[in-house]
UniProtKB/Swiss-Prot annotation:
Protein's name in the database: Transcription factor SOX-9
Post-translational events: Acetylated; acetylation impairs nuclear localization and ability to transactivate expression of target genes. Deacetylated by SIRT1.
Species whose genome carries this gene: Homo sapiens (Human)
Sample GO molecular function, one term: sequence-specific double-stranded DNA binding
Comp. bias (Pro residues): 341-376
Short sequence motif 9aaTAD 3: positions: 460-468
Amino acid sequence: MNLLDPFMKMTDEQEKGLSGAPSPTMSEDSAGSPCPSGSGSDTENTRPQENTFPKGEPDLKKESEEDKFPVCIREAVSQVLKGYDWTLVPMPVRVNGSSKNKPHVKRPMNAFMVWAQAARRKLADQYPHLHNAELSKTLGKLWRLLNESEKRPFVEEAERLRVQHKKDHPDYKYQPRRRKSVKNGQAEAEEATEQTHISPNAIFKALQADSPHSSSGMSEVHSPGEHSGQSQGPPTPPTTPKTDVQPGKADLKREGRPLPEGGRQPPIDFRDVDIGELSSDVISNIETFDVNEFDQYLPPNGHPGVPATHGQVTYTGSYGISSTAATPASAGHVWMSKQQAPPPPPQQPPQAPPAPQAPPQPQAAPPQQPAAPPQQPQAHTLTTLSSEPGQSQRTHIKTEQLSPSHYSEQQQHSPQQIAYSPFNLPHYSPSYPPITRSQYDYTDHQNSSSYYSHAAGQGTGLYSTFTYMNPAQRPMYTPIADTSGVPSIPQTHSPQHWEQPVYTQLTRP
């Protein structure tokens, strides 16, 4: 049994002073953790150590008895920690429990603790600057990396310790002691974590509280970031803040952002796609697009993102309207106010032509017909339309915005564009929004007219009809009679063809 002598000594020392081990974690483990490594005493039912240790080891063990660990353990540790000097300092015996009336009986070490105790001493000697916590982390990682053969010596030693412990303390019951110091630290850490968790929620709530003012309830539902961002813009649901959009960037943002933020229907490609990117072929083919299909993809609110754009560009205005539709009055009014001032007089004349279109528009969306009458001064129309989410605005929008040329012209003439926006806004603010975007995209292709080809040919005329464009074009507005887009709708409404589907969708909201 000379083989076991070192083990016995080690066990006694561990029982007396495991707490004195260099690392508090070790003492904690030994006293408190049944089986940190998962290979605890329960799983180590075999006691093969006596047989497994080579016969020649006793001599080595005797030599290293001062190390308090059998050679097999030391060899295993040194294998894992290759290159370390294997001079284990004698285990400091801190008589924690012995001083008390009843000396505290520590639980037998499990395999991991056996490994950690031996390896920690070695590492601590070699790297005295290492913090115990770092040592423990490293030891745990190394232990997980060990294979069964490498763990066997520790497992066997742990089993031996368990059996010995049972002999020494037959009545032993595990009664974990409260570690006040540890508990306090843990409690503090827990509190800190709780605080960290709470603070985000509080922030989120605060954001939500603010968000209702800036954005609709939907935006509130979205992440706090959106709320804060939207506070800048109209109340439209999850649309991009108006302030964010710059005239140049408005197209991309409207098209791209509205879907993610406000577009509940991410499927809409047009929002994400800059029509400018589309080839003229694609645009020309777009004519064949069913407006209703487009509407499907447009959010019922219109493009929430639209509000983001200010009346910067006509199509922007239209978008604004759509977003106005979403946020109907506030965004729409803002757009209107901006756009109305310059264009109202010119728009009024064009509005007369739109009125004719309005009747055809009813085909698209009867609810929106009323909007056509609002065509009065754009300012009025815009405001009215904005307030009349979708119906009137959509109607007008169809009439005016459908033609890509209109957009391109608007792009060319920013002031006129503003006028267009208001005009479109009144008609479409809610209803137009989906189309506005598409148109907007098309606008990006000023060749979008091909996209609207029916509207495009008419578009120029259409916009011409609108004072927004050149007066010459205004007359053409009536000619907009391109029915290619909307055969059912009068030629004038060819742009409306787009709008009609929009009406359906806009009306839905």
